[in-house]
C-alpha cells in the first residue's frame, strides 16, 4: 500500500463536523522581498501580469516571464477546469487588480480565488507545488449512506489521483456508481508540475477534504497548484480533461476502518489560510 492510500485510510478513521464559513479568498504578499519605485522589476512585473491576462482564458492556464535576473518577473495563473472562459478571464483580471492593490511593492505574492489562482515571483517557481493555502466548499447535503458513500468516493478519488499524474494536461475526470446514484469527480494539477509535485499536492488537498467534506454530497477543494471537485451530477468542464479509467469494484483492497462512522468529533477549521465554506 503506497503512502497516498495509507493517508486516506488513516484520515477516514475520523469524521469531522464544521460550522465556520467565512473565508472566500486568500491573498499573500511576501513583505520580505520588496521592490522600489522606479526600479526595473515593476516594469517586468506589469508585462508579466498583462501577458497572463491576455492568455489565461485560451487554455485555462498561462505562464509568463519578463526581464533578466535578478529583475526577472515570473507569473503563473490557472483557472478551474469547470469555469467558463468568460469566468476565467474575469477572475484573472480580478486577481491582478487585487494583487496590485494589496501587494503594491512586493516581489512575490499569490492570490487564491474561487475560479482561479495567480502567483508571481522574482524566482522561477513553475515546477514547485504549493498547497499550503486551501479553500474548501462543501455541499450542505449529507450522504444518506455514509459508509457506502465513503467507500465509493475513496475508490474514485484514488483512481483519479493515480491517473492525473500520467496525463499531459494534468486534468482527469471520471464517475462511480453508488446504489441508485453516481458520483462525478475531477482532479487537476498545474501542468508544469513534476509527477511528485502533483501527487503530493493532491495528497494534501484530499486529506484536507476528508477533514470536512467527505460525508457531503459535493465538494470543491482549491489550492494554488491543484484542485479537486466531486458532485452528484455530471461536471461540465470547459477545458478538456483526460478520461480516467473506471475505478475498480469495491473490495477489501480499500476497506473502511472498523467503526469509521460511529464517532463524530467536532473541530473548527484551521485559521492558517485554510477554511471550509458551505455551498
Located regions from the model:
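Extracellular secretory-pathway ectodomains and N-terminal mature segments of eukaryotic proteins
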Residues: 1-279
Amino acid at each position: 500500500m503506497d503512502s497516498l492510500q495509507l493517508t486516506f485510510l488513516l484520515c477516514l478513521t475520523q469524521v469531522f463536523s464544521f460550522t465556520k464559513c467565512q473565508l472566500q479568498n486568500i491573498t499573500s504578499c511576501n513583505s520580505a522581498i520588496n521592490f522600489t519605485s522606479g526600479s526595473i522589476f515593476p516594469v517586468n512585473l506589469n508585462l508579466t501580469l498583462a501577458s497572463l491576462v491576455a492568455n489565461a482564458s485560451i487554455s485555462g492556464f498561462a505562464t509568463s516571464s519578463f526581464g533578466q535576473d535578478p529583475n526577472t518577473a515570473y507569473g503563473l495563473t490557472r483557472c478551474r477546469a469547470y469555469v467558463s472562459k468568460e469566468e476565467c478571464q474575469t477572475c484573472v483580471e480580478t486577481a491582478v487588480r487585487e494583487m496590485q492593490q494589496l501587494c503594491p511593492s512586493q516581489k512575490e505574492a499569490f492570490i487564491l480565488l474561487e475560479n482561479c489562482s495567480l502567483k508571481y515571483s522574482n524566482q522561477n517557481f513553475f515546477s514547485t507545488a504549493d498547497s499550503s493555502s486551501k479553500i474548501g466548499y462543501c455541499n450542505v447535503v449529507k450522504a444518506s449512506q455514509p459508509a457506502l458513500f465513503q467507500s465509493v468516493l475513496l475508490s474514485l478519488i484514488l483512481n483519479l489521483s493515480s491517473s492525473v499524474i500520467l496525463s499531459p494536461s494534468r486534468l482527469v475526470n471520471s464517475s462511480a456508481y453508488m446504489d441508485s446514484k453516481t458520483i462525478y469527480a475531477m482532479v487537476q494539477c498545474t501542468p508544469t508540475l513534476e509527477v511528485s509535485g502533483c501527487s503530493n499536492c493532491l495528497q494534501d488537498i484530499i486529506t484536507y477534504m476528508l477533514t470536512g467534506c467527505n460525508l457531503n454530497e459535493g465538494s470543491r477543494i482549491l489550492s494554488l497548484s491543484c484542485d479537486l471537485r466531486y458532485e452528484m451530477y455530471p461536471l461540465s468542464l470547459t477545458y478538456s480533461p483526460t478520461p480516467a479509467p473506471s475505478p475498480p469494484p469495491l473490495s477489501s483492497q480499500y476497506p473502511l476502518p472498523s467503526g469509521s462512522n460511529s464517532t463524530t468529533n467536532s473541530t473548527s477549521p484551521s485559521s492558517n489560510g485554510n477554511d471550509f465554506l458551505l455551498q
